[in-house]
Swiss-Prot record:
Protein name per UniProt: Plastin-3
SUPFAM superfamilies assigned: Calponin-homology domain, CH-domain, EF-hand
Source organism: Cricetulus griseus (Chinese hamster)
InterPro entries the record matches: Actinin_actin-bd_CS, CH_dom, CH_dom_sf, EF-hand-dom_pair, EF_Hand_1_Ca_BS, EF_hand_dom, Fimbrin/Plastin
Domain EF-hand: 12-47, 52-87
Binding-site positions, Ca(2+) 2: 65, 67, 69, 71, 76
Subunit comment: Monomer.
Purpose: Actin-bundling protein.
Keywords: Actin-binding, Calcium, Cytoplasm, Metal-binding, Phosphoprotein, Repeat
Compartments in which it is found: Cytoplasm
Gene label: PLS3
UniProt GO BP: actin filament bundle assembly; actin filament network formation
Start and end residues of each stretch annotated as Actin-binding 2: 383-627
Taxonomy of the source species: Eukaryota, Metazoa, Chordata, Craniata, Vertebrata
Amino acid sequence: MDEMATTQISKDELDELKEAFAKVDLNSNGYICDYELHELFKEANMPLPGYKVREIIQKLMLDGDRNKDGKISFNEFVYIFQEVKSSDIAKTFRKAINRKEGICALGGTSELSSEGTQHSYSEEEKYAFVNWINKALENDPDCRHVIPMNPNTDDLFKAVGDGIVLCKMINLSVPDTIDERAINKKKLTPFIIQENLNLALNSASAIGCHVVNIGAEDLRAGKPHLVLGLLWQIIKIGLFADIELSRNEALAALLRDGETLEELMKLSPEELLLRWANFHLENSGWQKINNFSADIKDSKAYFHLLNQIAPKGQKEGEPRIDINMSGFNETDDLKRAESMLQQADKLGCRQFVTPADVVSGNPKLNLAFVANLFNKYPALTKPENQDIDWTLLEGETREERTFRNWMNSLGVNPHVNHLYADLQDALVILQLYERIKVPVDWSKVNKPPYPKLGANMKKLENCNYAVELGKHPAKFSLVGIGGQDLNDGNPTLTLAVVWQLMRRYTLNVLEDLGEGQKANDDIIVNWVNRTLSEAGKSTSIQSFKDKTISSSLAVVDLIDAIQPGCINYDLVKSGNLTEDDKHNNAKYAVSMARRIGARVYALPEDLVEVKPKMVMTVFACLMGRGMKRV
């Protein structure tokens, strides 16, 4: 640690600062950027107006970012606490950090990671996730060796060690992500366990989990903060899957007067859940809530919500469930919360929170509790009479979903829920430029919260800068694309930019492995064919448009060439293939590619339909994995 940070600081204080730093550093990259500061103030529920938060963050960056690289390192963080301690700004900052609750340092002596951040984990989360997983996998014969787990011990951290539970949870969140035939379930040697963990991590990445800083060895060792972080992402993706208008048209009942369907579609799942809870609270005559933390601590809003959504027995075959409101008047908060959870239990929804989690206002677990309520009992009716353009609700294409998952897996902030709406201020695109080694001058970038007046102008300036970077340092082909197109959310032109980002990212990985040799389509095709023929395989490909790719045989053979003997050819169909055969081959190929360690984002359908862009990424990822053999 350098001079500037060592002025009179005790070991205890240093440990506390490390823990605080880890709480703010959301993507665990060892630095705090202004997005993470915004998230911190948002989560801390501090009663500050937007402009005040902007001022505080600007001042923190000004005083704290001493080497002016646009982010705060751990040493700079210590400096803020040491030197700027007395200022109001630093006091507010400390207060915000202290409000992120529920932290339990590991046995008092936390492990320090290479970045010097302290890792702590939340007992409450462990307890909640264990109960959720026990219920989800109670009838799965492949998990009998670990389920049920005891929520009061460290069972969970041991249970994830062979990768099976993780693979199963991924499939529950996004069905069919992993081909069950690719999960090793017997004779679990260290090598076979490593493969399962590769499969789990690469599949988690493909559904949009941020796993950049998690390795298979971390999961095998059951590192609590990493296990809980990954599980929360997987569980959340499953909980949020249907909180989306194209998958759940009844959500249109939440439209407010004068609001268009397009505006409603831009809301994140969290915002929709809040809107849903308030819709029912309004109908019950109770006041609105603004969050799932401070505003639900007394359980009173929950009582009303349960009472509204409980089935009234009016539909055929639907038993009536009565919510007993007597606990509402209980004077003790914890007892009131317990009484409320007993009512939730009648609906089969006593999940994720204990009475203490409700009373402490744990934001993550309360969000999960409400999402589960929504999934079981939405209690919404699709509006029939209104003038609604239902054609807008087409849902995202496979390609859009793949791009979105790829971005989220790289840990962009904010999380991308809607490809076009969430890129309209270009912040995510600018972060992706950094991931492909195109330097971004963050002092030129406008950041949220944007001022009420002129917000769109600020976003447009970012979009113009994003297009400028694409044309010059990145040398993308952006003919006819302007910042306005990104700002308007023009699908075709936004996709053109995003595809070039993903392509460059994929090729960079290859160039890093090949000591900087340029990679392009021809080089990949030649490598694929050479590798296949050297392994004595009869398949080959002409290009990424080659129709024979639809059988997936070239992909399967290439995987077997890279890791000889890993493919079970009894499971692979050849000859005259039906659509089903092709799909089964593709599903097996994608899962096996992930199992041998290739981070494949494409979907089986991309191979069956021979989508050249996605086919290119599959072969490029496999080439990357093949080059690591040397």
